[in-house]
């Protein structure tokens, strides 16, 4: 089976069209071999069974892509320095100095790049290929090739690198667990890690442990890396752009229209570097408030190590982005008081790089807004510095000052605690809905943090949801196209909430029915949050409507499971009776729930086991409206017995207490619902009858 999730015809076609690259990985010397040609050669070698050749070509493809970017950055920096753009002069010839400098810079770039890269057209990869590299698909091929070559450490790192950008890929996760079983506890390396993001995460970890000196070291290094990456991102935006609204032969732009078209795309790209740098691999949405958070952590960390000058400097840097933040305003005032008599607080300014970035960002925003009005295109400014909810709901964010008379004034850190296995566990809270029936608690299910409920949804809702599922599900959806991700004896089909709403909005399924999926998942979330008596908000991490169907002719003498025994936020090691809470596990998941839609199938029981993955502690037969929920850690290993006849459907829900890991599609679905509600209100106010399905 192909390592990726789509047809590889385009890549293989590219291999056929590039005979010079096939069967080899480029000649020594000469211009840099295009990464798309090397990739095509690697894929061709893989499917031809030449795994050594595949690994060699894929490694060179990845290296070529990195070298291409590095060479373009080097040349663009060099030509920026050598050829300064001239100001416009007065009179009819006033534009000539500017355009003359522009032409000289273009010539500089060509003469700089051509010796190493060759003609620019050699490196214009197809969108599909660029997307593969963005999604790290070459690493999926690489890990398979390494397995065949018995290079298990390299295979594990390639699999881990792919998984970091594809966290829902269950097959790769299983592969990594197999590597751990085979080679013991291995140290996995993300070969495409963003250094500034790694340093930020390390800084936050040390901060959480109150190791403030180490936190400062990593967070300061993260800032250095961030600003360096921002400069690189700005420069890379100066490359070719696509004119999607004018991709037809008749388009003939005038001089200024063509310049404006291109520059607006460059400017929008540069403006969005802030989002790019704040986005983790494989995610669409950035970490909210990412850059300001560095200064927020640092202002308190510096206070705790006694460096009040740096604390005030970082507090004022943070206030550039959020000048009305009362907590940090109080902190800054407190730091000023600590410095009285030693340093004049007025001499301590926000950091220059933060001021410069914010000034540039505001100017970019202004130009984009002006251009949108003048050139007639739509532009909506994202909230790049958005803070999610109240400060106390954010993860590990420094807060305000409190006075404690017995010790004198000092800072009080208010932060949402990171969920730990030894936190106080509660259950038995209200179920919130009168029709929901309690069945079993943790003790009755022979475990910890478990509950079984019935009547969460009605028979009619089950039928309606099943009808929606039939209209929107695709084989392999949610499993990167793998139709049988856990067992070859069953077919898996799935869909997300956002997909359901999209289909409903397009009229492909009744919108009322599509919204039911959204509403019942929210109902389940509220029940779980209430029953387990959580003192902070429970967020969606992933929501998936999934049906698994027994394949006819493949059910005799089955001894496999529909879904192998696993834990949801750690890597289960049955032999060691351990569950390793580390990547690539979904370590941010805290609670899970399965809401069942039907019972007309054979097999498919949900089971809890001991950590040995063998001793069954509870078995649950699905039926319409039944929901099992549990904490996601190693205390609750679970799986699904083989479905031997019929189709088993359920809504699978995973939740997190960390808002940084909220489900991206859920946020988008919330926006769709808000938009639909607003449209509905608008129609009501105009006394217009909405469509039936609304």
Swiss-Prot record:
Fe cation binds at residues 566, 568, 638. It catalyses: L-prolyl-[collagen] + 2-oxoglutarate + O2 = trans-3-hydroxy-L-prolyl-[collagen] + succinate + CO2. Residues 386-418 form a coiled coil. A motif (Prevents secretion from ER) lies at residues 691-694. The keyword Endoplasmic reticulum applies. One of its GO terms (molecular function) is procollagen-proline 3-dioxygenase activity. GO terms for biological process: collagen metabolic process; negative regulation of cell population proliferation; peptidyl-proline hydroxylation. It is found in: Endoplasmic reticulum; Sarcoplasmic reticulum; Golgi apparatus. Its main location: endoplasmic reticulum. Residues 1-23 form the signal peptide. Residues 395-427 are annotated as: Disordered. Glycans are attached at residues 446, 535. Residues 543-657 form the Fe2OG dioxygenase domain. Keywords: Coiled coil, Dioxygenase, Endoplasmic reticulum, Glycoprotein, Golgi apparatus, Iron, Metal-binding, Oxidoreductase, Repeat, Sarcoplasmic reticulum, Signal, TPR repeat, Vitamin C. The keyword Glycoprotein applies. The active site is at residue 648. Belongs to the leprecan family. Prolyl 3-hydroxylase that catalyzes the post-translational formation of 3-hydroxyproline on collagens. Contributes to proline 3-hydroxylation of collagen COL4A1 and COL1A1 in tendons, the eye sclera and in the eye lens capsule. Has high activity with the type IV collagen COL4A1, and lower activity with COL1A1. Catalyzes hydroxylation of the first Pro in Gly-Pro-Hyp sequences where Hyp is 4-hydroxyproline. Has no activity on substrates that lack 4-hydroxyproline in the third position. This is Prolyl 3-hydroxylase 2.
